[in-house]
């Protein structure tokens, strides 16, 4: 698999299945996007490469959620997912390739669009969004950077990394999206309807198409968030009156009064234009929802995809709903995914180029279990199969193969191969440790344990020596434990350290030498931390002001994400960036607001106690984060600069005038604001950042705020670029 370059030297060509990797198309938070060319048909695709080793489990779960959501959506204006490949280190998403670039760059080049062209783009966006909402999917990160154009200048909605399934009348909690396009309820940290949040974002996009500027803009992040919450913006006179009423209905602070997609599609400006073609609509598909008699009739691949969506985390409840006789949301989503699987079966590639790689990417293929009618399909001669545990829980195909290979390697070392088959299908069933089914990287708590089963004669099958047995010889168990700490599990060569159970600890160290257990090197990494709390007392402030200050403090700290638990409780997570991975353990803590003193009449301005409780993570880093939040809570005037909380000094880039275009939109806002606050504190005049080369200062979308790696965890902001100053100052005047 080599090709000769001009200098006569051999250059290795990289392949993902039948696709040859070529130039890099872009770079995001989760990895690179490269151009792929099919070795036979020359079809071009975009291959998103996700490095599993460099991303946290929560981010990888979001990648799996994006895969499941893209399987649910088939629309001409939504980017298509073709296939998924994977090996031990990388995950490869084979996506539709569109050559027109981003709508953002199109706006930078052309300036504000004519109402006719803006209506064409807007109709396509609304058509695709309406299809997503009809399948209970909310995008939550709509902006021109995530809207791509094909060769005919038609819209493709991309980047569903922040998308969520909103079932029924439930509300969402995660604060995500870009500040210029986020609705007020998201900015305030309240629970919100994802569908209404998408409508607000579409209103901001339509304004940008028609004006070439954003309705809410400010160099100061705090001022920007305040403008969004007020919802007051300047409406240029050149916007048609009908369109002005549509914009005011979409960019409405009160979510209850905000227009719905149904009202938008009936609006006179949306319908207008007699000679304009209607947006292309997908062929409606009627999926029959039928009853599922038993667990054996449930397709394991579809079950995996549903669990990856994130809203069906309770596996037992999901199975109960699927087996119910009544029609419900779970069954509708199940049969939609099953219908997609039957129409686009994922099978092994037939013609692959010759490869000499040690661990080539393998295609995710359908398990040979059930078809849509509950009957077993004939098995393919493929190693990519699905193993099922005793409890009925499916194990991913790659995991099952490597478990079997690990068992073979162990037997070849010990010579105990008489009672075990070498086939991954006929080997003893494997009981994996519980892990989120939606995660592509389930973290094992140890080497997989092959559960011995009684043979018909009554003699148990031998247990592979690689599996530490509680009843085994202590020194052998200790030796195996040391060996596994170097080798890792069959799938992962670097395991996360887990707190061992007392039973495991007793096997790690012989009983005759308790001193070794006390001085074990595990103690340097595993600490059973006691609950640590920090209290902050606040006087003469109403509860609403305290909550707003806490949310603003969260938003002003890079790499900190939060979610709302109740009216007076938040949960936050801070992830340090840079430095060795061993020092990047996230800090998780809870914030509770309690009323401590004063009568009911004084409750509005009484004494409140804000309690910060450390849930997990380093205590010192927790205290530094709380100190930063505390300084902002107790400040009555200008907020202090957000401190640099990382343990390394190379994480923060000061204003250089060359702000990167990729990464999270908020993180570089934070970097700039930190410098601005610092300058103000020292009595200096704060200077705005320089204009990036790509955003011409003379164009209607001249300046832009940079994007960097976004905060992680549940309240993570997505990868992408953000717009800061879209348009000349005259177009950004705010109404008094």
UniProtKB/Swiss-Prot annotation:
Keywords: Apoptosis, ATP-binding, Cell cycle, Cell division, Cytoplasm, Cytoskeleton, Endoplasmic reticulum, Exocytosis, Kinase, Magnesium, Metal-binding, Mitosis, Neurogenesis, Nucleotide-binding, Phosphoprotein, Serine/threonine-protein kinase, Transferase, Ubl conjugation. The modification Phosphoserine is found at residues 294, 367, 382, 393, 412, 423, 427, 455, 512-513, 520. Detected in pancreas islets (at protein level). A motif (KEN box) lies at residues 603-605. Residues 431-445 have a biased composition (Pro residues). Residues 19-270 form the Protein kinase domain. Activated by phosphorylation on Thr-174 by STK11/LKB1. It catalyses: L-seryl-[protein] + ATP = O-phospho-L-seryl-[protein] + ADP + H(+); L-threonyl-[protein] + ATP = O-phospho-L-threonyl-[protein] + ADP + H(+); L-seryl-[tau protein] + ATP = O-phospho-L-seryl-[tau protein] + ADP + H(+); L-threonyl-[tau protein] + ATP = O-phospho-L-threonyl-[tau protein] + ADP + H(+). Residues 345-366 have a biased composition (Basic and acidic residues). GO terms for molecular function: ATP binding; ATPase binding; ATPase regulator activity; magnesium ion binding; protein kinase binding; protein serine kinase activity; protein serine/threonine kinase activity; tau protein binding. Changing residue 174 to A: Prevents phosphorylation and activation by STK11/LKB1 complex. The keyword Glycosyltransferase does not apply. ATP binds at residues 25-33, 48. GO terms for cellular component: centrosome; cytoplasm; distal axon; endoplasmic reticulum; perinuclear region of cytoplasm. Belongs to the protein kinase superfamily. CAMK Ser/Thr protein kinase family. SNF1 subfamily. This is Serine/threonine-protein kinase BRSK2.
């Amino acid at each position: 698999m080599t090709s000769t370059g001009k200098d006569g030297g051999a250059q290795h060509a990289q392949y993902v299945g039948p696709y040859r990797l070529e130039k890099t198309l872009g770079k995001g938070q989760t990895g690179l996007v490269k151009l792929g060319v099919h070795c036979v048909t020359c079809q071009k695709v975009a291959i998103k490469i996700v490095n599993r080793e460099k991303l946290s489990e929560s981010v990888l779960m979001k990648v799996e959620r994006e895969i499941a959501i893209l399987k649910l959506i088939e629309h001409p204006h939504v980017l298509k997912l073709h296939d998924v490949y994977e090996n031990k280190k990388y995950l490869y998403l084979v996506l539709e390739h569109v050559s027109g670039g981003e709508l953002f760059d199109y706006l930078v080049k052309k300036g504000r669009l004519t109402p006719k062209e803006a209506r064409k783009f807007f109709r396509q966006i609304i058509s695709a969004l309406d299809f997503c909402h009809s399948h209970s999917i909310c995008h939550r990160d709509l902006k021109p950077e995530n809207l791509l154009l094909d060769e005919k200048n038609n819209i493709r909605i991309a980047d569903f990394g922040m998308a969520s399934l909103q079932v029924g009348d439930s509300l969402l909690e995660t604060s995500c999206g870009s500040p210029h396009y986020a609705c007020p309820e998201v900015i305030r940290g309240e629970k919100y309807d994802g569908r209404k949040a998408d409508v607000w974002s579409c209103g901001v996009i339509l304004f940008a198409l028609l004006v070439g500027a954003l309705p809410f803009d400010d160099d100061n992040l705090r001022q920007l968030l305040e403008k969004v919450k007020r919802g007051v913006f300047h409406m240029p006179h050149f916007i048609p009156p009908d369109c002005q009423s549509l914009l005011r209905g979409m960019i409405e602070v009160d979510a209850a009064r905000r227009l719905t997609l149904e009202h938008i599609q009936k609006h006179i400006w949306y319908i207008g234009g007699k000679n304009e073609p209607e947006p292309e609509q997908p062929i409606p598909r009627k999926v029959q929802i039928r009853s599922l008699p038993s667990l054996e009739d449930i397709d394991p691949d579809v079950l995996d995809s549903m669990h990856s969506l994130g809203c069906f985390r309770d596996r037992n409840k999901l199975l109960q709903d699927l087996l119910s006789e009544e029609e419900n949301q779970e069954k509708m989503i199940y049969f939609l995914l099953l219908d997609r699987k039957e129409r686009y079966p994922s099978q092994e590639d037939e013609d692959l180029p010759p490869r000499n790689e040690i661990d080539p990417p393998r295609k995710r293929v359908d398990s040979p279990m059930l078809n849509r009618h509950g009957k077993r399909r004939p098995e393919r001669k493929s190693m990519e199969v699905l193993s099922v545990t005793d409890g009925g829980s499916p194990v991913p195909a790659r995991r099952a193969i490597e478990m079997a290979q690990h068992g073979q390697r162990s037997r070849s070392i010990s010579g105990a191969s008489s009672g075990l088959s070498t086939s991954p299908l006929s080997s003893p069933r494997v009981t994996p440790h519980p892990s989120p089914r939606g995660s592509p990287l389930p973290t094992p708590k140890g080497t997989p344990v092959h559960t011995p089963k009684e043979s018909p004669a009554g003699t148990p099958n031998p247990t592979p020596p690689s599996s530490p047995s509680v009843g085994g010889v202590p020194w052998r168990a200790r030796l195996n434990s040391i060996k596994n700490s170097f080798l890792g599990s069959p799938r992962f060569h670097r395991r996360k350290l887990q707190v061992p159970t007392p039973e495991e600890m007793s096997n790690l160290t012989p009983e005759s030498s308790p001193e070794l257990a006390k001085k074990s090197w595990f103690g340097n990494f595993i600490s059973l931390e006691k609950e640590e709390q920090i209290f902050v007392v606040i006087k003469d402030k109403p509860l609403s002001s305290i909550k707003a200050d806490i949310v603003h403090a969260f938003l002003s700290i890079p790499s900190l994400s939060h979610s709302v638990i109740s009216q007076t409780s938040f949960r936050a997570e801070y992830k340090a960036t840079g430095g060795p991975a061993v020092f990047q353990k996230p800090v998780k803590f809870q914030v509770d607001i309690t009323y401590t003193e004063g009568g009911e009449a004084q409750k509005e301005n009484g004494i409140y106690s804000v309690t910060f409780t450390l849930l997990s993570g380093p205590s010192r880093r927790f205290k530094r984060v709380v100190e930063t939040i505390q300084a902002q809570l107790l400040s009555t005037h200008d907020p202090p600069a957000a401190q640099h909380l990382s343990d390394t000094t190379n994480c923060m880039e000061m204003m250089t005038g060359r702000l990167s275009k990729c990464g999270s939109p908020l993180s570089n806002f934070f970097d700039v604001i930190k410098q601005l606050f610092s300058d103000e504190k020292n009595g200096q005049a704060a200077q705005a950042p320089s204009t990036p080369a790509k955003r011409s200062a003379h164009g209607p979308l001249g300046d832009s705020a940079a994007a960097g790696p976004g905060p992680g965890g549940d309240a993570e902001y997505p990868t992408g670029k953000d717009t800061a100053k879209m348009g000349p100052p005259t177009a950004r005047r705010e109404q008094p």
